[in-house]
C-alpha cells in the first residue's frame, strides 16, 4: 500500500463529460491532451479524465445513457472493458494502455470514470470473480441500484468475493496505467460507506498510486472525516 501523499493541491485537468457526454472518442481525447500538453501543462494542468461511456458501444446520447438496459462490454471476469469503436487502440486486449502511454509520453496523466457495483451483464452471465471460487450472483445486491444509470447493481460487501471483485477492477486499471479514478454513485442520494471502503482498499493495494475522486457531489459534510480518510476529492 502506497503512503505517498496524492493531490496535495486540487488536481487540474479536463473531463470529457461536459463537452462530449458518453460519446467521446480516442481522437477527441488525444486532441484535448495535445492542447493541454502544449498550452496548459506549464501552468499545472495534467489530468485527462474519460467520463462515462468508454465501455458502451453506440452510447452517444443522454437518452441512450438513461436506457433501462444500457449495452456494456465486459470481460470473462465481469469487468467493464473498452469499446474499441470509440477507442481503436484498445483492440487485441490492450485496453486503455496505449492511450495512457500516449498521455504519459506528453507528461500528462489519464483518468477514467467508473460506477459503484457490478455490471448487470456480469450478473446475468454469472461471471466468475477473478482469483476466487465465487461468482457475480454470490456478491450482488439487486436491491441496490443507481437512481440515474441502470447498468449496475450494488455489491453486498458482507459477502465473500465482494472485496476481491473490486480488487480485480483496480488490478485491471493498474495494468492499463490509469492514474485517476472518478468513482460515481457513492455519495448521493445514498452514502455507500461499505463500497467506498472497498474501492479505497482496492486502490491502495496497488503499487501504482491512484488519485481517487468520489461522486456525485457535493460531499455530505456529516461524513467529512470518513471522506478525508478514503479519497483525495
PLM regions: where:
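Extracytoplasmic, non-cytosolic globular domains
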Residues: 169-218
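Substrate-binding cleft/loops of secretory-pathway carbohydrate-active enzymes
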Residues: 218-233
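Stable alpha-helical elements in mature extracytoplasmic
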Residues: 25, 29-32, 92-99, 166-169, ...
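N-terminal module-boundary/linker segments of secreted carbohydrate-active enzymes
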Residues: 1-30, 35, 210
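Aromatic-lined carbohydrate-binding/catalytic grooves of carbohydrate-active enzymes
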Residues: 36-174, 178-185, 189
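Short, hinge-like loop/turn segments at secondary-structure boundaries
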Residues: 128-131, 200, 229-231
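Extracellular/periplasmic catalytic domains that process cell-envelope and extracellular macromolecules
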Residues: 4-9, 41-43, 103-105, 174-175, ...
Amino acid at each position: 500500500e502506497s503512503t505517498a501523499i496524492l493531490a496535495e493541491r486540487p488536481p487540474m485537468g479536463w473531463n470529457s463529460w461536459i463537452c462530449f457526454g458518453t460519446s467521446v472518442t480516442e481522437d477527441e481525447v488525444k486532441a484535448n491532451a495535445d492542447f493541454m500538453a502544449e498550452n496548459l501543462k506549464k501552468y499545472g494542468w495534467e489530468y485527462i479524465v474519460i467520463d462515462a461511456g468508454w465501455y458502451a458501444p453506440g452510447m452517444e446520447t443522454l437518452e441512450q445513457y438513461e436506457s433501462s438496459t444500457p449495452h456494456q462490454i465486459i470481460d470473462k471476469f465481469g469487468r467493464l472493458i473498452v469499446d474499441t469503436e470509440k477507442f481503436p487502440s484498445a483492440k487485441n486486449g490492450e485496453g486503455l494502455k496505449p492511450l495512457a502511454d500516449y498521455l504519459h509520453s506528453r507528461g500528462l496523466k489519464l483518468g477514467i470514470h467508473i460506477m459503484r457495483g457490478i455490471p448487470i451483464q456480469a450478473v446475468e452471465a454469472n461471471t466468475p470473480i477473478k482469483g476466487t471460487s465465487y461468482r457475480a450472483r454470490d456478491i450482488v445486491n439487486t436491491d441496490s441500484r443507481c437512481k440515474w444509470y441502470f447498468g449496475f447493481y450494488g455489491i453486498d460487501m458482507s459477502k465473500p468475493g465482494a472485496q476481491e471483485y473490486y480488487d480485480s477492477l483496480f488490478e485491471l486499471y493498474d495494468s492499463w496505467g490509469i492514474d485517476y479514478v472518478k468513482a460515481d454513485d457513492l455519495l448521493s442520494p445514498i452514502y455507500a460507506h461499505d463500497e467506498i471502503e472497498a474501492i479505497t482498499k482496492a486502490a491502495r493495494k496497488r503499487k501504482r498510486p491512484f488519485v481517487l475522486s468520489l461522486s456525485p457531489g457535493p460531499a455530505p459534510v456529516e461524513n467529512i472525516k470518513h471522506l478525508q480518510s478514503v479519497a483525495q476529492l
